[in-house]
């Protein structure tokens, strides 16, 4: 040890010394991002310098995405550090709230509240001009106020990105700066169901069309260890058709639906969402291949619209993550657990 070195204690491991020179500053610059104004915590900087940065990819999936809350709760309880987060569709909404610094318990409480049928009805606003059944404005009005003063990526306490899809080129669009409202609104714009929006001249829809489990983006952000969560289950005969009775009742007032009655076809919402579910399950598993750990909650008994079953869905996320804990701890090196001072 000499006066030009500074020891960095790491729990019960041998003391580790980082030189007090440009190498440490370079590590800090690697961790700093143009969207993070808050100071970088020492333990996160140390993980970056030592190649142990942990990132998580939260996949899309409408109500299935509530399982992410269970995943994050287990990681938090077991002191698994998450340095950065990338979300798709419902995963983008949860990822943003997590990166904003909200506690998991508060997020779960809000999920239960928002999952009430009365709240779901409040989120319905039919579009009269935009290319989608729902305009999406009421969904925005319900969620954005929950973020409080955190309205831009620059306000977040953890690095975060969301993904959307350019419907004209098919390209994945990574969003990591500017308005959080625009970012999650683009990421949840399920084709046909929720109207797309324009950002920087690009027409954007649900990120699940191009990358439902954005593990690759987690790597691009500099994560050394990636945890990927695919919450979308394969279709199960008889379960996927239990889509909300609200939709079926609304179809009865559509004059054009008269000609399609009694022909044995699912309604428009069933066809669209079942198609998206099949796509996101298969493509999501493929996109998650590069992750170090893959968490797949068993949500085969649920449907995409059952937000009112939030408690059960979150429990499935907890169960799946607990099963993967030994591997997660091994990958993040919990033998040398970081003592958090954040």
Where are these regions (language model features)?
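A short alpha-helix-loop-beta-strand transition element characteristic
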Residues: 146-158
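Active-site glycine-rich loop that binds ribose-phosphate moieties when present
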Residues: 144-147, 185-196, 207-213
